[in-house]
Amino acid sequence: MNPALESKVKQAREKLDAHVREIVEWHFNPATGCPFWLNKQKEWNLDVRKEVQKFDDLKKLPHFEDDWLRGGPVRRWLPKGLEGRPMYVFETGGSTGVPKSRLQIDDFRTDYENFSQTLSDKTFPKGSDWLMLGPSGPRRLRLAIEHLAQHRGGIAFSVDLDPRWVIKCLKRGEMGEANLYKQHCVDQALTILRANPNIKCMFTTPKLLEALAEKINLAHYGITGIFCGGTELTPQFHRFAREELAPGIDFVPTYGNTLMGLATHKPFDPSDNYEIIYHAPQPRAAVEIVSPNDAEEKVPYGQIGRVMLTTLTKETFIPRFLERDQAIRRPPCEPYPWDGAGNVQPFQGLGVSVVEGVY
């Protein structure tokens, strides 16, 4: 690592440590914290504000449990310091049982305004409209893309898409029904594109991008930038998208979910062999790649491990959550001087079948 990057890494770590202190102070202070974390602090018999002074101190807390967000009174997650504000409740996809829920006020706006700074104004031109070809319903993504479009001076046009119906079809083995529903969503997108020539940008998933590109030449319809997220963003698909599905169009892959927000990708470099390397939006969220057998230990660079997420905002504190994804641990880079996650895929060690549907 060169000295300039090493200095950036150190500064980023100091910023993360300071942010951890601020967020822990907020969530575990009786005047501002939420009932859930204040009760947990009593249960642990731990003065969290005293014990957690930097990011590494979060190891003193147990891993965040998946089931904590599944059901239960959702207001237990509302910090007292934010009471009285208009709220949203967003759900995860529900591909592994009861959906997880997250209360939000402004986090989705902040996350996507920050993400907007990484987009090219040439290929995602300000003032242009967007097509949202992705999940609707109780997911944060639809409102987030809408806000991203508005933040950049445009309007977002959305299809009506229920991924849970697709998952039900696939679990029942009804592939034909699932494909009909996918075509129904693509038909909606085609109708929107034909009626709105100011659409230059779009969000979609790998499977839906492929289905749409089979029907039309996206560049001929004026699309100049594609923001793509989902579980099928392999190096093979990445190359296929750039060379076959959307040649000449700026292809921007992301990794994200309702709990984290979204991670941006390291700028495209042919030497990466089309591997997509993501970097979390520190200090608001941090990702570590840990050993599948010992989550207290990071794997060496270049090795595959399980993704461990920590979310650090005033609206949401999620420490050391073991995601259902695996990735290759990658080193810091100039734009993002902290660890990256390469070639993210569903984690192989869960022992449960995960149906991804339209993603």
Segments and roles (model prediction):
Residues 1-26, 152-359:
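Active-site glycine/GP-rich loop and adjacent strand/helix microenvironment
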Residues 101-105, 141-144, 169-170:
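Short, conserved acidic/polar surface loops in the N-terminal third of protein domains
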Residues 142-156:
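Conserved short alpha-helical elements in the N-terminal third of ANL/AMP-binding
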Residues 33, 45, 93-97, 142, ...:
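Glycine-centered flexibility sites
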Residues 1-91, 97-129, 134-138, 151, ...:
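Nucleotide 5′-phosphate-binding alpha/beta core
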Residues 39, 147, 239:
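Surface-exposed charge patches
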